[in-house]
Amino acid sequence: MSYDYHQNWGRDGGPRSSGGGYGGGPAGGHGGNRGSGGGGGGGGGGRGGRGRHPGHLKGREIGMWYAKKQGQKNKEAERQERAVVHMDERREEQIVQLLNSVQAKNDKESEAQISWFAPEDHGYGTEVSTKNTPCSENKLDIQEKKLINQEKKMFRIRNRSYIDRDSEYLLQENEPDGTLDQKLLEDLQKKKNDLRYIEMQHFREKLPSYGMQKELVNLIDNHQVTVISGETGCGKTTQVTQFILDNYIERGKGSACRIVCTQPRRISAISVAERVAAERAESCGSGNSTGYQIRLQSRLPRKQGSILYCTTGIILQWLQSDPYLSSVSHIVLDEIHERNLQSDVLMTVVKDLLNFRSDLKVILMSATLNAEKFSEYFGNCPMIHIPGFTFPVVEYLLEDVIEKIRYVPEQKEHRSQFKRGFMQGHVNRQEKEEKEAIYKERWPDYVRELRRRYSASTVDVIEMMEDDKVDLNLIVALIRYIVLEEEDGAILVFLPGWDNISTLHDLLMSQVMFKSDKFLIIPLHSLMPTVNQTQVFKRTPPGVRKIVIATNIAETSITIDDVVYVIDGGKIKETHFDTQNNISTMSAEWVSKANAKQRKGRAGRVQPGHCYHLYNGLRASLLDDYQLPEILRTPLEELCLQIKILRLGGIAYFLSRLMDPPSNEAVLLSIRHLMELNALDKQEELTPLGVHLARLPVEPHIGKMILFGALFCCLDPVLTIAASLSFKDPFVIPLGKEKIADARRKELAKDTRSDHLTVVNAFEGWEEARRRGFRYEKDYCWEYFLSSNTLQMLHNMKGQFAEHLLGAGFVSSRNPKDPESNINSDNEKIIKAVICAGLYPKVAKIRLNLGKKRKMVKVYTKTDGLVAVHPKSVNVEQTDFHYNWLIYHLKMRTSSIYLYDCTEVSPYCLLFFGGDISIQKDNDQETIAVDEWIVFQSPARIAHLVKELRKELDILLQEKIESPHPVDWNDTKSRDCAVLSAIIDLIKTQEKATPRNFPPRFQDGYYS
């Protein structure tokens, strides 16, 4: 219930609701609640006494009667469980005085204020009604002036003089320089006498691409866009850029050449740049010809006559500062067949850019299978193919493997052949359904064909096996066969995820054979400690066989030279976004033909190899050519903001021009979410908040959390949380030590009931250990199962975020630990409130279920009903919560719907940083609700005070976003300081103050 007041605030003179004024009644009164749901035990008529159903009901009606009665019980239980929002008399009087003091100022301003949290009621397009109002022309003039002022503010925000550190290299001029041209030519000629260069030249000459150098250079010179396709190992990534640069230098035009080559992964950008530098007998970066730039890390080449390898995101960042990429002569988009979201967007941007940069050369490099599609997208531009350089690889399908090793599964019962088939997980795609129908239709004919070519026992096993599961026992049997019957060589096993990798590792280690020092078994996954994974690149001593168990990271991101045998499990973990239910899903999908080809190629790098595909021939014939492009299976909010900050036009229009446009439903859902976040106005233009969020290199909700961390002066811990959510948390899980790792994580959690604060505690403990020296840092990471590399990355990201905030004016120092930005960093509840401000409306309700044996907690969301906290969370076994609400970062459906990264939050967190507030009465219970479903008990006068204080917060936050500057906490008489202090005080003192539980401290040789 809203209230338009014209009187002073006070305990007896406050706004009155339909239920009366503020005069009497205790702040948390419950009188009469229990009576409302009692009585009526036999009120159903007939023989319904003692809670039994009426006698005239039959069959389904009886069930419905009991269901209705249970629903009433649940509703009443929920009423009784509601937390009470209260404040003591002293704070109530202080807030009344505060609201009175700002009343006069607010009366002079328009009442059409913008709420960050309830854009349905207020927005940038809100109009003040002028009908039947005296002096309406004057009001219209005022509104026009406000709109003009708004445009001026937007101009200032957009054009604030701040250049991201990652963009500095691009903005260096690239003018032709005759003196430099001559020097570059002389340096290249000298290199040809350098023994290191000569040695590398011998290697380069063996690559298939080297023999096509003239043809490639001529094609690029004579066309604005060229598509180059080639197999793995042909040399296209390392050689084409060098061909272009050397051609320019030899023609005396070296200073005019500045090549930028994009890579889909950080590791690729670094490794390729270092390889090219080595081939040119140079060190990487240091002002030489070749360098790299990835987020927060770079070794930059010289300004002109150079090659820069960078991640795709770096170029998208550059476009904010220079939309024409005016200093770049050649842009090479590599690995475009992977179809990640950023590369798809960049292709469309570059396609538009060609209309303004006739001098820009664009080279698209892809695997062979779909080069034609890219050529068509760029107006049928010319294509050229470079043959691969791999040894022959013998391929086997599932039926071949079973016949070869005579495998018999443990389970003898006949399987349900078509239980799920192509419809893995919950991915509801029409193509998958169609392929499932085809598979089912063709299966009988395929079995008859198998019986003509394979033994009866093999066909029986094929029919017996579960088609939708990876048979790990089969993989163990196949590895044993290779070890005992085949020649030496490393074995690479592809599995979809951590659970499969862990289980296979355990199965192997349970056998005496694999426990010996004749085997080196290496799991390869992002959750594994990096130090263990470095062994994967080292060749083993004679007599030792290496077995690598990996996800699809080993398809393209890394090369293991000594692999001879590849076991393709046939599955890949893929994330999709269900627009109808607004939920991400992750499931094990069948690999595509492109995946299978990449996996096969891993076996033939240094000698002839073998590839075992663990799916049958019918399945192989129906595999998709490629994985679904990322743009079609991911939320689009961050991309929508990028489109607007780059001024690429209307969101839906731009996205419709991509090679594979996302669905209208996905686009509209993302736009709606951004409007709810108040990042876009009703005309789909960026709001001041939207501009700031678009410039932060994170997802919008995390960006909002960062801004609130600055405004509420708890910057350092909030930046740690933001970095972790946008990159990954620093925890690792060594195989066999999962339970110990979980215990250590809960130890770091202390009593916070927060995954987010657990990461903060881990990070702060690492910082303290690092200050003491390398040995202490190493011991700390070892004891708490932390990755020092990830922690260092989080540290670097925090510095980048602070740079953004300084450039935008939100803080006065680029140091995340600046005391002025961390006044409230030692209070857990303020940090939780800021987490809530960023992640809302990702809220779940906790309900305690008192079972006969032990307490249990059930968790519900508004849209999904019953969900589960992810097993990795510190809250997974928690039953003693202070409050009934969790805020979470990610909701994903796998085997169940899981909440990832969750934190317990208090009522005041949700009231001040949640959605729209309403004041209601539920029977005899006075309530205050957030978005109508998060309901608390509250006396009416307290509810009105909270609602009015929230309005003041919304006004203040909007002013801070439009004109960013740090809060002056010393100016206690200012409105900003008074409003924020009052809210902080309420959050800090609800129930009882909760001091931060700090990370383990090093004492007497131990962390405690």
Swiss-Prot record:
Tissues where the protein occurs: Highly expressed in testis.
Phosphoserine sites (modified residues): 161, 963
Reactions catalysed according to its record: ATP + H2O = ADP + phosphate + H(+)
Residue numbers binding ATP: 233-238, 557, 602-605
Family: Belongs to the DEAD box helicase family. DEAH subfamily.
Known partners and oligomeric status: Found in a multi-helicase-TICAM1 complex at least composed of DHX36, DDX1, DDX21 and TICAM1; this complex exists in resting cells with or without dsRNA poly(I:C) ligand stimulation. Interacts (via C-terminus) with TICAM1 (via TIR domain). Interacts (via C-terminus) with DDX21; this interaction serves as bridges to TICAM1. Interacts with TERT; this interaction is dependent on the ability of DHX36 to bind to the G-quadruplex RNA (G4-RNA) structure present in the telomerase RNA template component (TERC).
Protein name as annotated: ATP-dependent DNA/RNA helicase DHX36
Organism: Homo sapiens
